[in-house]
């Protein structure tokens, strides 16, 4: 890991300062958590896989016209990214019923949704990331109405691109969690932040519905590293 000052450490990544005030280093850890940190393990090599998979996906999104914080990969665990003021929201888009969605609405896992459903959650571990609606978002000033529409439009575009990308790898994109931020030197520019990897996507094999994401860890379904490596392999992402 870089010897520069750590700005922030989360559950799966560390953000490290650089000499350029407009960029930071994003370091991918091997830590795996579930149920708001109630379940925890270190799985050697997990961070390396996520670094490469996320870089690959961010590059695909940039090619498709989506603005992201990704600049380039520095090494097996680190990326250079644009420094952002993170919007304190997790934006979840669902294509197939799974996880908490099934529990909240008593719906069977695996039911295809007629169209993608977007949900917002307030990023706050102490409050267990509560679900919020657009009125909450406006009241607390996290986004303006115009910005909210921009985030929703961008989210659906990202979802469409990734549904197709994973489908070509014989994988269903069940749902995914996105985060956005504003450039430090341009408070009106909202771009995609964080990562896109098996850590924050639900991914199922299209033939067997075998889980290839963090649910393998959550539900004790097998070897997490093997599942993540399978995703990388199907996307033709090189890990060395």
UniProtKB/Swiss-Prot annotation:
Q: What is its EC number?
A: 6.3.2.6
- Give the main EC class: ligase
Q: Does the keyword Ribonucleoprotein apply?
A: no
Alphabetically sorted, this entry's keywords are:
ATP-binding, Ligase, Nucleotide-binding, Purine biosynthesis
Which BP terms does GO give this entry? 'de novo' IMP biosynthetic process; cobalamin biosynthetic process
Q: Name one GO cellular component term.
A: cytosol
What catalytic activity is recorded? 5-amino-1-(5-phospho-D-ribosyl)imidazole-4-carboxylate + L-aspartate + ATP = (2S)-2-[5-amino-1-(5-phospho-beta-D-ribosyl)imidazole-4-carboxamido]succinate + ADP + phosphate + 2 H(+)
Annotated Gene Ontology MF terms? ATP binding; phosphoribosylaminoimidazolesuccinocarboxamide synthase activity
PANTHER family from the UniProt entry: MULTIFUNCTIONAL PROTEIN ADE2, SI:DKEY-6E2.2
Q: What is this protein called?
A: Phosphoribosylaminoimidazole-succinocarboxamide synthase
């Amino acid at each position: 890991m870089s010897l520069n000052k750590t700005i922030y450490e989360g559950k799966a990544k560390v953000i490290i300062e650089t000499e350029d005030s407009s960029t930071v280093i994003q370091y991918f850890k091997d830590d795996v958590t579930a149920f708001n940190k109630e379940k925890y393990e270190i799985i050697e090599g997990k961070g390396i896989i996520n670094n490469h998979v996320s870089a690959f996906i961010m590059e695909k999104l940039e090619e498709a016209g989506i603005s992201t914080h990704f600049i380039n990969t520095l090494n097996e665990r680190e990326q250079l990214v644009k420094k952002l003021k993170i919007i304190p929201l997790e934006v979840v888009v669902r294509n197939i019923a799974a996880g908490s969605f099934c529990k909240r609405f008593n719906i069977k896992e695996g039911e295809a949704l007629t169209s993608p459903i977007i949900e917002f959650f307030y990023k706050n571990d102490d409050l267990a990331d509560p679900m919020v609606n657009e009125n909450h978002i406006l009241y607390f000033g996290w986004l303006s109405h115009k910005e909210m529409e921009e985030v929703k439009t961008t989210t659906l575009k990202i979802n469409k691109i990734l549904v197709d990308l994973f489908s070509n790898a014989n994988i269903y994109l069940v749902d995914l969690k996105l985060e956005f931020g504003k450039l430090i030197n341009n408070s009106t520019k909202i771009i995609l932040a964080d990562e896109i990897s098996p850590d924050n996507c639900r991914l199922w094999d299209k033939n067997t519905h075998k889980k290839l994401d963090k649910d393998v860890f959550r539900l004790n379904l097998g070897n997490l590293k093997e599942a993540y490596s399978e995703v990388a392999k199907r996307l033709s992402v090189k890990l060395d």
